[in-house]
Amino acid sequence: MANAFTYQILKDDTQHVVIKLTGKFDGSGQESNAVRIMANSFSGALATNGYPVANTQPGGVANTALSYYGLSLYRLWYDCSSSTTADVEMNWQATAPQTLFLLNGNGEYDGNGNWITIPNNTLGAAGANGNIGIFTRGMIANDSYTIIAEFRKHNEYYSRGQFRDPAAFNYSPYGLTPGGNNGLDH
């Protein structure tokens, strides 16, 4: 048996993405994956030209992904089954990665209650792109983890429907602007 890892998107809408990650270990080594969650792969991710990354521009030209995609950790449920003092580290990817969460045992974090969402603290740092990595320490044969993480997508990096229905978002040419710029002159 070899170490086995899974990645499953449970929900991906205009505001949130929920992802399930698992890892089962055979004792042959640790997980060291700097891009376990790729931020530009989610529904509505915008390209440098303002179109969705997944589509092509008029004329069939491929879109270029942004260099960074903003996510905030909204909720987290985890279970790390380990016979030693092993742990799982989730981090925000950058040249100098920043720890998002250290996981050991089981627990949850919920930014929906009195807690706040946890933003990516690598924004503006060298090599920051919004991706999330997973690294383990001390995992041996028959150890495992399950993580279910919900992230909030930041508006400036993901489409919320403003291109399909600009009037609903008060975007031009349907936007209402104070001072008469929209022809109402009041």
Question: Where are the predicted features?
Answer:
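Mixed-charge, glycine-accented linear interaction segment located at domain edges/termini
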Residues: I140-H186
